[in-house]
Design a protein with these regions (language model features):
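Peripheral, non-AAA+ core regions of ATP-driven protein-machinery
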Residues: 1-5, 11-289
Length: 289
């Protein structure tokens, strides 16, 4: 073909005469993908295979397609949002879990060079139940806003609703906060949300979630200049998280002046203009404000 890039949309519609089955069958997927892989290796052409996905967002059909290719990328979007996230879940030649953020404009998709700007909302005045944390996506540090609303439950069983946060982990964090910090949320409906539609999959956001819950319960805003990260253990200890210095540098770059982090994540030289407080216990973190 003489082309540098070949895009096949979609691989489920491809058909090989060597296989007596309908397009989309497992045998057809395996044979067509193998033929395209051989072509890519022999010609040096970059081949992009577009695959169907299920309602759950996974590649449709058996995982044979994922096993045969070098890289698997998911193109994700939320209904009504102009932003799209390109996420790598497999990469034989580099780091997985990398993301690229794009915005849909009149001219088509355009790269968002500063993803933290779309996930982060800076309130003009501090509001209760809102805390900024720093999550890692591949090699990127992203600032995101965690919001928690605690409201008096009018039913017999208080609700626990989590959007962008694992619901089981939210329940566990509230139990730890009650046991080790005396946070009385048993009669409260608790709603937790990550702003911007992003999913907080790592434990580094634990401390921010509990701080936001206490802030909402007492209706006491935390400083606008604060960021917090750290994993919370069942014994009420604040455990260190990977890439602490990188997280702090990203926060300082966006103008945050105060950080509440695990003691083990306190750097010898904090970023210029930032005060970093280290904590080892949950009650120590809550007493800081």
């Amino acid at each position: 073909l003489g082309a540098r890039v070949l895009i096949v949309d979609s691989i489920q519609t491809m058909h090989s005469e060597r296989i007596e089955s309908a397009p989309g069958a497992v045998s057809q997927l395996r044979e067509c993908t193998a033929e395209l892989v051989r072509f890519a290796k022999a010609s040096g052409t970059a081949v992009l295979l577009v695959g169907h996905v299920t309602k759950e967002g996974q590649i449709a059909g058996p995982r044979v397609l994922e096993h045969m290719v070098d890289t698997v990328l998911y193109f994700e979007s939320d209904t009504g949002s102009r932003f799209r996230v390109l996420r790598s879940v497999k990469n034989r030649f580099g780091a997985a879990n990398e993301i690229g953020v794009f915005a849909m404009a009149e001219q088509g998709l355009r790269e968002v060079t500063n993803p933290s700007a779309i996930f982060l909302s800076r309130h003009a005045k501090p509001v209760s139940g809102s805390v900024i944390t720093v999550m890692r996506e591949g090699t990127r540090s992203l600032l995101i806003e965690v919001q928690v609303l605690a409201d008096l439950s009018l039913g017999g069983n208080p609700r626990r609703v989590a959007v962008g946060i694992d619901a089981n982990r939210l329940t566990m964090l509230l139990a730890v906060a009650h046991r080790h910090a005396g946070l009385l949320l048993g009669g409260q409906d608790v709603f937790a949300n990550v702003v911007g539609g992003v999913r907080l999959a790592e434990t580094a956001g634990d401390l921010a979630i509990v701080l936001a819950a206490r802030s909402s319960l007492q209706d006491v805003p935390l400083p606008n200049s604060l960021i917090a990260f750290g994993e919370l253990g069942l014994a009420g200890e604040i455990r260190p998280v990977p890439f602490g210095e990188e997280r702090l540098r990203e926060a300082a770059k966006h103008g945050f002046k105060l950080a509440l982090v695990p003691e083990a994540n306190v750097p010898k030289r904090p970023p210029q203009g930032m005060t970093v407080r280290g904590v080892t216990r949950l009650n120590q973190a809550l007493d800081a404000f």
